[in-house]
Amino acid sequence: MTTKTQNRHSAAAMAALLLVFGASTANARSWRINNDETKKANFTSINAAMSSEDVQAGDTLYLDPGCVIASQTISKRITLIGTGYLSKAHPTAYITGGLSIKAANTKVEGVYCTGYVYVQASYIILERCKVDSYIHTNGATAQYVSFRQCLIGNYIEGKGTTSNETLGWTIEGCIIRSGYSDGSVRSLYNPIIRNNYILNSYTSTTYSPSALRKITGGLIENNVLLNAKNTRAQTLWDVENSTVQRNVMSCDETKYAATYPDNICLDLGYAEAEPVVFAKTGEDMNIYRLADDSPAKGAGVGGEDCGPFAGAMPFVVYGRPYGIPYWIESQVGTRAIDGKVNIKQKVMMQND
């Protein structure tokens, strides 16, 4: 049984470890965020940190394990590091409502957002994050935004196929599972879309559910792209002037064989295709590792595997930030000895 005392000591120990390991430069400073004032963090929210004159561009903010904050805005160029997500052994910090990122060159890593994310400046990086809803710009200009190793529960949307306002986005090593009636990834100009699993499970043909829609000038390679069976003819929809190569995708063979010859066409919907492509075993997103006889094995450019667990930025289950320690076991003594309580913790380092 996990006690309040155990949680309190574990959070405090992890916070100390994060500050020890997290400092990146001599000048930049590190700050803890925790909505629980009894944890004695530097700030109770990201918003409070942004309002402080002490927090400067280049600083790093760490979300304490178990921290829960709502509707946050990043208005300074900082690095925000979370705890990863949904690990049974480690308390998750998360942001409810939404996260708006308004400062260019901001990096957000290992953060769980239960709502939307607005990317409202250029050169933003989201890495190892979980976003349960959608991602778009909310009307802002945001060039060269990168999404790496992220788990997205709805869609990613730019501002159009000829708009420089969302030029040059990169989506790599991600798992994107949308049930939306439009594209799971859509309205992008000159993007790089590589080594992802992108699904659109919406079944009605009244609309245009697609894995990729309205993409111009893109490089699209080494992905697994799946649609529902009755919409498999539109897995790629309005994709123009793009290099589409070495992907595994659900499709109508009569249409795709000629249009996209350098790809593997599965005349199946996602429900039938997933057990063919993926192992479908293990916990959490490990189910999307390739099956031993998967058609995606070695099917990518240069003989690489397709899908999110291959390539230069392979997906990381639970989204733990690289180089950050996390505790997987904590034991608190049941009896004080000489006024002291014995606490034992097993701490691991995320090394991939």
Indicate residue ranges for each PLM-predicted region.
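Acidic Gly/Asp/Thr-rich repetitive segments characteristic of extracellular carbohydrate-active
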Residues: R29-V68
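Acidic glycine-/aspartate-rich tracts in secreted/extracellular proteins
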Residues: E37-K39, G66-C67, G84-S87, M249-K255, ...
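Bacterial Sec-dependent N-terminal signal peptides
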Residues: M1-S30
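Right-handed parallel beta-helix/beta-spiral solenoid domain characteristic of secreted/periplasmic
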Residues: S71, R77-Q120, R128, S133-Y134, ...
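Extracellular beta-strand-rich, repetitive "passenger/adhesive" scaffolds
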Residues: E37-T38, G58-D59, T83-A93, T106, ...
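Short, compositionally biased P/S/T/A/G/V-rich stretches that sit at domain boundaries
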Residues: E304-V341, M348
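Predominantly extracellular beta-rich ligand-binding scaffolds that present long acidic/polar faces
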Residues: V108, V117-V119, T137-G139, Q149-D284
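C-terminal accessory segments
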Residues: C265-R320
